[in-house]
Amino acid sequence: MTQITEKELKKKYLDLLSQNFDTPEKLATEIINLESILELPKGTEHFVSDLHGEYEAFQHVLRNGSGNVRAKINDIFKERLSTKELNDLTALVYYPEDKLKLIKSDFQNCGQLNVWYITTIEHLIELIKYCSSKYTRSKLRKALPKQYVYIIEELLYKSNEYQNKKSYYETLVNQVIELKQADDLIIGLAYSVQRLVVDHLHVVGDIYDRGPQPDKIMDTLINYHSLDIQWGNHDVLWVGAYAGSKVCLANLLRICARYDNLDIIEDAYGINLRPLLTLAEKYYDADNPAFKPKKRPDKHERLTQREESQITKIHQAIAMIQFKLEIPIIKRRPNFEMEERLVLEKVNYDTNEITVYGNTYPLKDTCFQTVNRDNPAELLPEEEEVMNKLLLSFQQSEKLRRHMSFLMRKGSLYLPYNGNLLIHGCIPVDENGEMESFEIDGHTYSGQELLDVFEYHVRKSFDEKENTDDLSTDLVWYLWTGKYSSLFGKRAMTTFERYFIADKASHKEEKNPYYHLREDVNMVRKMLSDFGLNPDEGRIINGHTPVKEINGEDPIKADGKMLVIDGGFSKAYQSTTGIAGYTLLYNSFGMQLVAHQQFNAKEKILSEGIDELSIKRVVDKELQRKKIRDTNIGKDLQAQIDILKMLMHDRYLD
């Protein structure tokens, strides 16, 4: 095979490129276009974290752009519309279908409704013009409803300088109304506003967990115009289960049972839990208090006694399977340093006690019926069969395949983006702030290199689903529970102790020193430098740990270098945080942190127009307005420009 020189490769590349730009005019037009785009203000980035399956609250934050929609409406209309009119317009943009029904029911005749249509279309066109003022016409066109692009563009770019087209514009709108297209046009315009106020979405981890509708969140994200995902520990647990890790699968089923969310498995993903229920009914009792499902905050109707009994039994069955499955992994991976988590081997089955970390505790609420005390790792044949069936069902679920593939395609363990570092959990460090080392396959890694190796193995496990006990699959589980995991961020997961030991001191999970060192500005600067980012300009944007604002905790740490945006979408955390989560906005003028009040119901917004927002705090104002050339996208565009200029000189100027 002949070796191609770099010069020949460059020539072939330019030959291919010249097929798209076969005249100097075409090439010049593209260069002019790209150079001009670099001078536009950077788009608004929207950061959300720790969604935990709370679809309704997440949907609302997306629809209101963390208050951005209302801010734009106020900018234009505050002096022209009453408070009620402002509220109605805001609710219409958030929930156009529902608000339209309410508004239309208030009108007595078609004439009044038609006047409202004309006024509302004018307001929405004006709003779109304002929201799109920093975009090219091409980018705006992509945000408009396809079936109405022509009409909307005519209305957007109309000129009142001359009267020649006055009746033309009036007829456009009147015909839309007469042909019964006004509702659909208004709905399309409302969604265009939602899209235009946020250029790019960052989901900083944990789409999955105890909330009831992570599948709906995934469907929403798949259809979102521009986003990235930094995996959370719960996301990786689901990826691991789909990739072939039975212990990850057992963990997520246990969590679903604990929080009465098994309908995610059965109804959302179509996975049959009947074999697991049959096993559970055979071996376990219904009256074990440690395994009764938690009450769901979003469920008004109580579980029937039969439903609670079934879930309690399933919960015990899958927990025991989980503890058994952990044993062989811990034994074949001594570098995981998890010998203390061989919990079933540490139980004294005669005295009903366990010795862990040098302390002996009596056990309560035990359910060791299926444990072979001579070989605690041994699964019963029925348990083995159930796990094989469940894994097969998981891997054959088309919807789950689509969701997990999207997580892999759009996700990563961390992301440097526009000078900031986005990471869900932590960067494992010791008490002195030095990066902790972890051995994988005979090599030692730390810091960014460790995270890169972890991510490589997540992707390898996902690509090789037929391998269920290889190193890569074991490492996905380690990311969920290991002490050097960037996602877990603690020294040990005390699941067993929480079920079976009354002494709460044994439940404590010691956090990685990262979580107190991140208050130190010099430490954060060092971490930014280690990841190749400018410590003077960059920040770390973090999720994973709920910010307890109710206790005075501040999400802005280390002189603004560290921003923690998990305030608790999860209803379960809201009593401890005092709020319903943080989100972050980063536009060309700077950063704003938004604290959200608990989202109760969209009905209140529809009827009263009052949004449960959101207190904004300015994190930072840019001294100079940031342009696209200052962003990741700008660097990509500049690289394209450099290549196009090379082609221009090679073909047309030399």
UniProtKB/Swiss-Prot annotation:
This protein's pathway: Carbohydrate biosynthesis; gluconeogenesis
Pfam families noted in UniProt: FBPase_2
Annotated InterPro entries: FBPtase_class3 (IPR009164), Metallo-depent_PP-like (IPR029052)
Required cofactor(s): Mn(2+)
Keywords: Carbohydrate metabolism, Hydrolase, Manganese
Enzyme class, broadest EC rank: hydrolase
Catalytic activity: beta-D-fructose 1,6-bisphosphate + H2O = beta-D-fructose 6-phosphate + phosphate
Residue stretches of biased makeup (Basic and acidic residues): 298-307
SUPFAM superfamilies: Metallo-dependent phosphatases
One GO molecular-function entry: fructose 1,6-bisphosphate 1-phosphatase activity
Region spans: Disordered: 288-307
Disulfide bond annotation, renumbered to this chain: none
EC number: 3.1.3.11
GO process terms (BP): gluconeogenesis
Keyword Hydrolase: yes
UniProt entry tagged with the keyword Manganese: yes
Family: Belongs to the FBPase class 3 family.
HAMAP family per record: FBPase_class3
Protein name: Fructose-1,6-bisphosphatase class 3
Species this protein is from: Staphylococcus aureus (strain NCTC 8325 / PS 47)
Lineage: Bacteria, Bacillati, Bacillota, Bacilli, Bacillales
Gene that produces this protein: fbp
